[in-house]
Amino acid sequence: MFKSIVCSVLAASLVNAGTIPLGKLADVAKIGTQEEIIPFLGGAGPYYSFPGDYGISRDLPEGCEMKQLQMVGRHGERYPTTSKAKTIKKTWYKLSNYTRQFNGSLTFLNDDYEFFITDDKNLEMESTFANSVDVLNPYTGEMDAKRHAREFLQQYGYMVENQTDFAVFTSNSERCHDTAQYFIDGLGDQFNISLQTISEAESSGANTLSACNSCPAWDYDVNDDILDEYDTTYLNDIANRLNKDNKGLNLTSDDASTLFDWCAYEVNVRGYSDVCDIFSKDELVRYSYGQDLETFYQQGPGYDIIKSVGSNLFNASVKLLKQSKTQAQNVWLSFTHDTDILNYLTTIGIIDDKNNLTAEYVPFMGNTFHRSWYVPQGARVYTEMFQCSNDTYVRYAINDAVIPIETCSTGPGFSCEINEFYDYAEKRVAGTDFLKVCNVSSVSNVTELTFFWDWNTTHYNATLLKQ
């Protein structure tokens, strides 16, 4: 199946692409060979399946029938943002203006290296067949979304066999919208899908997939005092090593940090990155945990505002589950950003909020939070609601792995009995108040998420934004 998808994507892209990104012959031996480092790139690199799957089968438990399916997905693999590209270019400027032969792990720059950001119009955008640096790149956001669609049909195709007309929802970020459209394309032309584009502007208030944007109370520097405790001398070690090998280069610890971003985004658009080979395995581990720390304390359980922000989408999800018997649509697919998914998972309780991460050292026992496990590019969180005999159950599948609710998993396939789930959900949102905690009224008078229910009459079509 995958081979046929590749062929169809290549054929369509060849028709639409003016210039084919052939890349260099040397790329052939390297492309797709660095998958072992992807989990250490903090979610900036390509999609991969959740490593801690507990061995639980993704199959529907025997004798059960799926009643409703929800999915919240992240946009696919992409180029860096404009701001991130600025820092990468700053480091590239130092390297490209170095007048001597490179030594050590930078020797690849002697071999007619082509910087991976060849056109600024690609910044912020999904990586595609047409805008990749190499035609053989297996990690494009375009291919990821289309492959996801085919895997969706293989896993859940029976859910849409008799429901060929339905809506798919996306934020109006262009890369999220593109991911949704590529996913729809991957489903095939047998479906009549209405793509609803929901604004992520702060004026949308609660009626959004991106509640964090409607939260003026959000403090982007929160918990910096904790994060500052983390030992980042490994970045100095990287810079010193490169400078020692290359006299007069004068890279800084900031440059060393930037090289990790360079590595991740180049893999997204070239299929591999020689920059990734600069780092030792220990350095990758230290960088990865630094990303975990930052996420935990600024986008996850370590920031007390997050549970309220995530409750906006979680409450809507629970409402859809409760209305499963009366809703004409039983598949709800949405595409947004990593921050929104992290907020959502925090409210659900999938991310452990009982034990704060330490900044004093890298913990190897008892640490269950790894940013890139939850939100690699192309991440997807499924909510499955199924009936077995006369009882109904709910469970979550994240990036191809069933992740049970630890305190409610005695049902078939480690699911949670529906009434127990509703009790659990009520406890999770107790004390949360998105509108009040975020001071939403200062930017919007929209107090409810309604697009799942009124899309057929409102027809959401927000202007696409390159962000």
Q: What residue ranges belong to the model's regions?
A:
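Signature for phosphate-centric chemistry
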Residues: 18-167, 171-332, 336-467
